[in-house]
Amino acid sequence: MTKEQYQSWSAPFRSPRGERWLNRVNFLLTRLCYAAYPLCLLWLAATRDSRGIPALLVPAVSFLLVSVFRNLYNAKRPYELLEIQPIIHKDKKGKSFPSRHVFSVFVIAMTFLWLCPPAGAVFLVVGVLLALCRVIGGVHFPRDVIAGALAGIAAGACYWLIW
C-alpha cells in the first residue's frame, strides 16, 4: 500500500463524522467478538460439552504463537512508514504483522463455525469488515490483515483436523 492508495481508500472517512463512524465500527466489531467468545466458552462449560477444551486451547495457543511471531518480526505500521495520520488513533510502534485483531476474530469465527456454522459464517463476515476497518483506519497494511485472517483460518482448521 502506498501513501496515495491509503489516502484514496480513507478519503470517504476523512471528516469528523466519517472518523467517528469508522472508529465506532472498529470498536463494536472487536467488542462483539471478544464478548461472544467467552460467552461461548461459558455455554460449553455449563453444558459440559466436550468441545470446550479444544475451543479454549486452539485460540489460546495460536494467539500466543501469533503474539510471539509479531514481537520477533516487529513489522512497522503504515503510519510509521507512510507518514500518514491514521483514522484509528494508535501510538504503538511496530508489531503490525500479522494483525492480531483480525487473527483473533478469524480464529473465533472458526471456533463458532465448528460449533454452530451459521454463527461462524456471521463472524467470518465480521472478520472481513474488521480487516477493512483496520486498513482504512491506517493501522495495518493489507498484507497484515490478510496474514491475520489466514493464520486465524489455519489455526481454526485444527478443529476439523484434530477433533
Residue ranges and their predicted role:
Residues L57-R70, A121-C133:
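Small-polar-interrupted transmembrane alpha-helices in polytopic inner-membrane proteins
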Residues F27-R31, A45, L115-P118:
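Membrane-interface junctions
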Residues L42-A46, V66, R70-N74, L113, ...:
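Membrane-water interface at transmembrane helix exits
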Residues M1-Y37, S50, V66-G94:
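N-terminal transmembrane-helix/juxtamembrane module of multi-pass inner/ER membrane proteins
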